[in-house]
Amino acid sequence: MAEEDLYDVLGVKKDASEAEIKRAYRKLAAKYHPDVNHEPGAEKKFKKINEAYETLSDDQKRAQYDQFGTTGSQAGGFGGQGGFGGFGQGGFSQGGFGDFSDIFGDIFGGGRARRDPSAPQQGRDLQYTMTLDFMDAVFGKETSIKYNRSAECHTCHGSGAKPGKSAHTCSTCHGQGYVLRQRQTMMGMMQSQEVCPTCGGKGQVIDPADQCDTCHGAGVTEERHELKVKVPQGIDDGQQMRLQGQGEAGKNGGPYGDLYIVFRVTPSRDFKRDGNTIYVDQDISISQATLGDHVQAKTVHGDVDLKIPAGTQSETKFRLRGKGVPRVNGNGNGDEYVTVHVKTPKTLNKRQREAMLAFAAASGEDVKGVKAGFFDKLKDAFEDNK
């Protein structure tokens, strides 16, 4: 028989926030607690609620459950950072192997040191994707963003209790956050530690009547957070920026997590970018390439004068020092490279044709040319009469 989905156990959606999960757990735990609910099956239901909360309130276990539909060693994989991969430090975390070390530690008398359930814990990190226009990425900008996050409850200041009320030590685990269970194994009677089913591993409980009316005992609420962001100059597509303390609220008075902004830059029609270097295409005529000229070349800093030497060949590149993208650290600008393309006219009027034939003759070239068609002759006549 398939096990009931843990999200269904708590009555929340799969994308529920930490605050929503905690609020649902508090409500159900108060309803099915064995001390207040003596109906048949209430204790079993209460245990299932605690098991669901133990998994879904832990970032690592929740990510593993979402991926494999289970937790612990059954998944057989490495754990991640719970909903926010790619920004933390490299390497593997213990993931699904944590349960094994707990069990073996209990069997052989050692075990890992248990974390104090009331110790402050940092909040979860968040990710925000910001789309930038090409020029805004080059020169930076100041803007405002809005996003949802869990924040410390302004009424109870994170305690979860009404003003004048407070949590008290859990009578089941006596503040330890876990209980000892004995089970028969092939090696005899063994003792293991499990998360306290009453307090969910926190070591403290708040009576339902004493819970904060705003956050319902969760200590956090969902908010639409607005933040001013100064985008630095020289940001490139795919780069990220960390804003400390702008993530979700911590637990037990712990610090907020961080916000990571990932930048997506809209391509430009005029410029191509590679790091701090800009590439531009510039069309010039045969006359300009042959005789030389000065043209206005586009740069991200505005148009500049570009000298075209006489005899310039098509696809020649010119370097404009310091006309590229400003470096993020403020240490100058990159360069720009202008590639010139000599454009050959598709049609010539009569005077242009005669001039080109004369040029060919002066160059010792026996160029016969191709006779112009009716429409070309008509166009030449029109041009000559101007």
Swiss-Prot record:
Locations listed in the record: Cytoplasm
Cofactor(s) it depends on: Zn(2+)
Zn-finger (CR-type) residues: 140-224
Biological process, per Gene Ontology: chaperone cofactor-dependent protein refolding; DNA replication; protein refolding; response to heat
Alphabetized CDD domains for the sequence: DnaJ, DnaJ_C, DnaJ_zf
Keyword Chaperone: yes
CXXCXGXG motif repeat boundaries on the chain: 153-160, 170-177, 196-203, 212-219
Keywords tagged on the record: Chaperone, Cytoplasm, DNA replication, Metal-binding, Repeat, Stress response, Zinc, Zinc-finger
Free-text comment on the cofactor: Binds 2 Zn(2+) ions per monomer.
Subunit structure: Homodimer.
NCBIfam families: DnaJ_bact, PRK10767.1, PRK14276.1
Listed name of the protein: Chaperone protein DnaJ
Organism encoding this protein: Limosilactobacillus fermentum (strain NBRC 3956 / LMG 18251) (Lactobacillus fermentum)
Gene for this chain: dnaJ
